[in-house]
Amino acid sequence: MNARHARYPFLGDARDAVEEAGVDLARVVTEDDAVVERARERVVSALTDGTIGEPAATVSTRVEVLSYPVARVLVSIVDESVLVRKYATAEADAAYDRFTADESTDTDLKSVSDTTRVSRDTLLSEFDLRAHVHATPDAHTVDVPTYLLLASSLRDDDWRLVNRALDDGRVPVTDAELDTLIREAIRERVADGLPLSVPDQIADALDEPVAAIQDALADLDLTREIDTVVPELFPPCMKHLLDQVQRGDHLPHHARFAITSFLSNVGLSTDEIVDIYEVNPGFGEEMTRYQTDHIQGDSSPTEYTAPSCATMKAYGNCVNPDDLCDAINHPLSYYEVKLDDGDDDDLADWRDREDDDSPD
């Protein structure tokens, strides 16, 4: 195990190095507190600030390398989709920062030896992308199927294929854009296979760090950047309220706040929410825009989260609950589970549906 494995623990040769060292994971989690603590830090930091934390100077290369597979075990034991996503994103972001620094000619690499660096070409080969990414005089082109696969989770309109130039079945991309696509490949690699099946012997030894992660998860702000709008997957309560809005029914203030805050939390802009309300006879653009901006924190110091299930029940807005409703306590949690259980190929954001101009 070397320094490059510590910086890029998802690489195949890092995994091979761990196997060649004959590491017994069951012994590590029971006897090596430093590895377990660093693994806990990776996961908790992913939840609290979107990073994997910076290892202390006293953390050895071995500890840093082994903390990665132990972190994946911790994520698997907790077994929450939001944790898998946030952890994989944090690991990918950390790797992105490192390999783009390695590539940059403007970065002082005196402290980064050749044995710790990873090039863009190395990563393309690692993810079997070399045959699908082609050098050009300007930068690169990416085969369309590969581009669609890697860009599928990137929500900015600039990544939509309809907004890209095409060159003989390939998508031209800049160096920076290619690095972003590589970051997505890393994220998929980290998330692949999670949650793992964890033997009871290992899970029992990790009770304390698992409890710490669960505490951090409980404190997680639900107003995360979902930014995917698939009304078919909305919880029954929000489907009902959205149907009422689109039928032109009058909604009391608490119901209007519930659906507006939910739509805001899942990624709709003020303009998009105003467009939805236009069909309602009680619609007033100025007031709707003001209320939505206030909920989103644009005109107030607070960004509001959609009401919890308990609040929805208290106001009589909990309707048609299904089996999943019994297992969650917040409409956003319901939607998150539905998104994670869905097939990415079938999750068409209503904003991307060419034939629809509203989330029916």
Curated annotation (Swiss-Prot):
InterPro entries, alphabetized: DNA_primase_lsu_euk/arc, DNA_primase_lsu_PriL
Cited SUPFAM superfamilies: PriB N-terminal domain-like
Pfam families named among the record's database cross-references: DNA_primase_lrg
Name of the featured protein: DNA primase large subunit PriL
Region (Disordered): 340-360
Family: Belongs to the eukaryotic-type primase large subunit family.
GO cellular component annotations of the record: primosome complex
UniProt record, GO biological process: DNA replication initiation; DNA replication, synthesis of primer
Entry annotated with the keyword Signal: no
Function as written in the Swiss-Prot or TrEMBL entry: Regulatory subunit of DNA primase, an RNA polymerase that catalyzes the synthesis of short RNA molecules used as primers for DNA polymerase during DNA replication. Stabilizes and modulates the activity of the small subunit, increasing the rate of DNA synthesis, and conferring RNA synthesis capability. The DNA polymerase activity may enable DNA primase to also catalyze primer extension after primer synthesis. May also play a role in DNA repair.
GO MF term list: 4 iron, 4 sulfur cluster binding; DNA-directed RNA polymerase activity; metal ion binding
Keyword match Coiled coil: no
Needed co-factor(s): [4Fe-4S] cluster
Cofactor stoichiometry and binding remark: Binds 1 [4Fe-4S] cluster.
Keywords: 4Fe-4S, DNA replication, Iron, Iron-sulfur, Metal-binding, Primosome
Binding site for [4Fe-4S] cluster: 237, 309, 318, 325
Description of how the protein assembles with itself and partners: Heterodimer of a small subunit (PriS) and a large subunit (PriL).
